[in-house]
Structure formats: structure tokens, C-alpha cells
Amino acid sequence: MIAVSYHDRVNVLQSLPLASATPFERAEWFSLLAEEGGLSPFVVLAQDGSEAIALPLMREGGALVPLANWYSFSWGPLATPDADRPALLTAIACDLARKTHRITFAPIPEEDEAASGLAAAFRAGGWAVLEETCDTNHILRVEGRSYEAYLASRPGQLRTTLKRKAKKVEVGVLSCFDPEVWRAYQEIYANSWKPAEGKPAMLRRFAEQEGAAGRLRLGIARHEGRAIAAQFWTVENATAYIHKLAHVEEAVPLSAGTVLTAAMFAQAIDGDRVDLVDFGTGDDPYKGIWMEETRRRIRLDCHRPGHPTSWPHLARATVRKLASRPRAV
């Protein structure tokens, strides 16, 4: 028999053998979001014997949303390897009707059927589910190539830039956490075009954890001894994740950011032998220079159709759907 329970601490995730393929599916990540990110967990757990599935959520206004922030590339249900996902998710969907009238799930990966599984379960549980694309994920499938072969497939302008500028910049890539290098990264980020770091303590603690586990790849580019560009990557399960990158204005004439990116790709492809490079969310044009494929990120907006506050949302969705239909000639 399936039992559904609710928890205001993420500790419950640590006691379960939940499968985690990405940094954003580990219990430690949700602990960081709660402890350093300042978020208040609302974890929904369905269990049937040894089978379990969890939805790490939080309250936002009158709705439930994923326990996530801007550092999270994606979000999805966490399950034990043998879990009956449809049955457990449907049980959660039915029970959540007692807790809220609206739940928004995003950004959900398109490629692993998490979005379709959630949508089917919540529709079976009596929810009206609105689905849309909310973001874009740029990736590179290495497909056994060496870095040299990969670089040969890049645009000619990029290869020319690297030939002209590579010798003017010194690059280093660390796989362990170094406080001095991290301070250099923070200084570069603070003086770059990027907005102020939202949760610097959380990001540092994440970097420390990844460094202790051997997953950190922290790159720094220097010119005449001064750090002018930095990138924060991690490597896990044959995938390299590009978390943060920044450079100061003085780095632009030297193309230091480009030179550092090339060094990071070389480390990931030839050094770490990854199968995939994940550039996170955001459809920035520069990502297309390095990456070869995009994947959709999905938003599911789930409403209880009998609740009055749901009616305006459902009405607007109906109007948009009708307006998008081709008109008869």
C-alpha cells in the first residue's frame, strides 16, 4: 500500500537510496538550498515497501514550486531504482489535492520523460495540467572525439582567435578547492558584466563539496600574473557541467574568456573523458559557438479545476490554445 507523507526538512532524502544522475538530484544539493540558500523545504514522499519517490518542493505564495534556485539546471522527481513511478506519482498527485490548488514544476528535462510522467500522473489525479517550454539547454555530445577533432569542427573565427591569443594568456584548471583561487574567482565575478552573485556562501560551499569529491574543475586565466577570467565547472557521471563563467573588461582584447573556455573543454574531453558537456539553461547566442544541440526545459502548471482561483489561469490557457489554431480558409 502506498503511503504519502510530508516533511519540512530534507533529511528524509538522505535516508533513502534515491538515484541521482546530476548534481541537482543529490540530497546534499537540497540541503544546500535549505541551509545556505534560505529556502524552506516541503518534501512530498510516496513509499510502497522499498519503493519510493520524492518531490522536493517549497511554498511560494499560494502555490507549491520546486525546491530550486537560479543555480539549478533542472528539477525532477527523485526515485529509488525499482520505483513504480506512475503509481507513486499518481498517489502523490491525488493526495496533494488536500494541500494546495496549484503546483508549478520547472525546469523539467524533456529528454528523460520526467515531464511526461508528471503530467500523466497529475492528470490522472484530477489536475488540469498546462505544459509549455520555459527554457533552453545547450549541450555537446562528444561522441568519442578528441579535443583536437572537436575544435576542428568549431567555427573558423573561433579557431583563429585561439591561435592568435592563446599564448598571451596563462591558464590553469584546478580539481580541488583552493581558497586563494576562489577569492580570485569572486573578484573576477564581482568586477565582470554579471549581476551580483545571489548566494555566494552557497556557491562556495558547493565548490568546496565538489572539490572534496574530486568533481570540481575551477579554471583561471591570467595575464602578466593578474587573474582576469574564471570558470566554475564540475564533472560527474561522464558529464561536465558549466556552472559559472566571468571575465573582467580588461580580458576582452585578450579574448581571455575564449582561451579559458577552450582549456576547460580540453580538460573535460581529453582529461576527464566526458560524454556530454552541459551548458545549463539560457539561450545565449555565444553558447552555440561551443555547443551542437539544444534540449527543451518544460514548465508544468497544475491546477485544481474546481478551485475558483484556477479558473482565470485555465481560461487564459484555453484562449491561447484557440488563438494558436490555424484558421479555416
Where are these regions (language model features)?
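Short, high-confidence coil segments that cap the C-terminus of an alpha-helix
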Residues: 39-41, 98-102, 216, 272-274
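A general structural signal for short secondary-structure junctions and capping/turn motifs
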Residues: 33-36, 94-97, 128-131, 268-269, ...
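A gly/proline- and charged-residue-enriched helix-loop-helix capping module
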Residues: 69-111
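A conserved beta-strand-loop-helix scaffold within acyl/acetyltransferase catalytic domains
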Residues: 2-64, 107-137, 141-253
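Aromatic (often tryptophan-rich) hydrophobic motifs at membrane interfaces
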Residues: 72, 90-94, 193-312
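Conserved beta-strand-loop-alpha-helix junction that forms the acyl-donor binding cleft
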Residues: 105-115, 278-285
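Active-site/acyl-donor-binding loops of N-acyltransferases
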Residues: 59, 120-149, 272-329
